[in-house]
Amino acid sequence: MTRPNKTTPPPVIEASRIREGLPFPLGATWDGLGVNFALFSANATKVELCIFDDAGEVELERIELPEYTDEIYHGYLPDAHPGLIYGYRVYGAYDPANGHRFNPNKLLIDPYAKQLVGQLKWSEALFGYTIGHPDGDLSFDERDSAPFVPKCKVIDPAHTWGHDHRVSVPWDKTILYETHVRGLTMRHPSVPENVRGTFAGLMVDDVLEHIRKLGVSSVELLPIHAFVNDQHLLHKGMTNYWGYNSIAFFAPDPRYLASGKIAEFKEMVAHLHEANLEVILDVVYNHTAEGNEQGPTLSMRGIDNASYYRLMPDDKRYYINDSGTGNTLDLSHPCVLQMVTDSLRYWATEMHVDGFRFDLATILGRYHDGFDERHSFLVACRQDPVLRQVKMIAEPWDCGPGGYQVGRFPPGWVEWNDKFRDTVRAFWKGDDGQLADFASRMTASGEMFNQRGRRPYASVNFVTAHDGFTLHDLVSYNDKHNEANDENNQDGSNNNLSWNHGVEGPTDDPEINALRHRQMRNFFATLLLAQGTPMIVAGDEFARTQHGNNNAYCQDSEIGWVNWDLSEDGATLLKFVKRLIKLRLTYPILRRGRFLVGNYNEDIGVKDVTWLAPDGSEMTIEQWQDSHGRCLGMLMDGRAQETGIRRKGGDATLLLVVNAHHDIVNFSLPEVPEGSFWTCMVDTNQPTVRGQERFDFDSEYSVTGRSLLLFELQREEEE
């Protein structure tokens, strides 16, 4: 059904002010004399630029963009300057059955807007159709949405960066620290109340000092692009806290700007760089906040729905929903691909960001018939002279058919490895049949990533992430406790592979608490001593809790915020984690550039990794297949070849021993060439670091149940 477009004109129309302008660059660009406006739409018939007062409340004039070049509507407004508040109204067919949902009664956000002002206010006027109408989304709503929509603001991009430069931490030295702008700063005692929850809060010295002293390399921020709070959450007094509901890919969310100025983000980046920390942004290019056919018309839906979104081929009224949120952006369309890559380049060049983590990244590599590692977007990122220099991290799955693509992204990408999470959790919980998989996870899951010249760092290892239990809760709860989300505890995963160790939630039992803390040390030691790229979630390093909530997406509250009031046990864990990170960075063998494969290298007479049974002998096939096996030694030979050059390495030789049994296992320490004895550097049974003890070859070490040890080979003359 095709509907006519009607809209009430504003009080003033001054078409004579506009000039032709240029179709490039897209967005609103100030050149010092005026502002050029350019908007892509392949199917619109007319575009109006709407100018608002400084408060963004009164529409002052409406000006038709006069030119249309290569599917770009454009015009130039002389004497316009930064600070100008604007939006668009776009005309065309309202024909949902054929994918078109133009409605000029709806003020639209420029997809290239660099700053938004105001917050979205939910109203029925936001929808292109009339809610409650018998025809549903086929109906046409004539109410003006301008009073309820955030407005776009023209910016002056000039900024004095001083000596700031990209930190460029090598992948083998990268340790990711996943956090949230509000979550990290809302309860920090050193952050002034007026900047808590903002980029300015992240600049506070004590916040940066904690991250720097921890030893991580890269701060990965949950989404900071402007986003929309879901209406149903606001009705319950909640918000879309995590921010995975973007509406403007070039604009930081206004709520994170204490000063209201874009420069605040740049200053934050400069402060982190000064602390030698990279800035990684979690980005959500797989969908927008406009939802499915019943969602609001806020931006791309009203600009060119049929171009921006993937629609059902047999009925374009409906959206393909590989994101699980109602819609899916179509990166097979060249202009959508351009928008996403332009956005990435903007954040990398103009905002000095060091890398990106892509939410539901499989979508970004989808054509109509599924995922293709040669997708134009993935190829463009590899070839682009800017993007090929920054870190690209994929969450390699989505909700669509064939969405699980771990290990299948092309060279140049690293990937979240959820198999590491699941295997490590199951192993330390004591599940049967985990030993062989555990060994694979400790060697960067080579069966998935050791191909096409990819390196071990391609596997991003994690035990916890923002979605799911915190590390403390992983060892304290068997079941999720999401009652605070007001969804009858139906939200969040039920497959947590968690274990409460005897009591659900907090307990005063000293034995249970001791075991829980040992398990946290086990998880951290496994993560930080494994090959691959480790990722830590902020607060886990001192046992932060969400009280059993494993889906705090809507908890902009003390549930979702980091509590900086450390307990004695939390402070002890923090010291332990710092020591593990220092060990990882000190010993290159823990972060090799080549996969450990367990083959004997005849050229240099060395086997890079040897897997040992408790009696000190090599593991047999039968032992690998024993579903009850829970104890293993991992001997990493420092003489193993480190590069493509066939020569011996010069690194330390280390022995990692794990015991996931309930009881003590006596482990025979092996004799190794060019060594004299072993020293113990880590024992997770010990909450504090102790002096290095000497252990002779073939001596037995009593490995406590549920513990991990790390030994270093020493020569007699090194005493």
Where are the model-predicted features located?
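Conserved, mostly hydrophobic/aromatic
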Residues: 39, 88, 179, 221, ...
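A generic secondary-structure signal for well-formed alpha-helical elements
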Residues: 84, 92-94, 183-184, 188, ...
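Substrate-binding/active-site clefts of carbohydrate-active enzymes
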Residues: 145, 180-353, 360-386, 403, ...
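Short, flexible loop/turn elements at secondary-structure junctions
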Residues: 41, 67-69, 79-81, 92, ...
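Conserved alpha/beta catalytic core and glycan-binding cleft of carbohydrate-active enzymes
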Residues: 367, 373-538, 542-543, 547, ...
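Carbohydrate-interacting/catalytic domains
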Residues: 1-177, 182, 199, 507, ...
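Beta-sheet entry/capping signal
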Residues: 36-38, 174-175, 217-220, 276-278, ...
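Core domains of carbohydrate- and sulfate-ester-processing enzymes
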Residues: 90-160, 231-239, 245, 275, ...
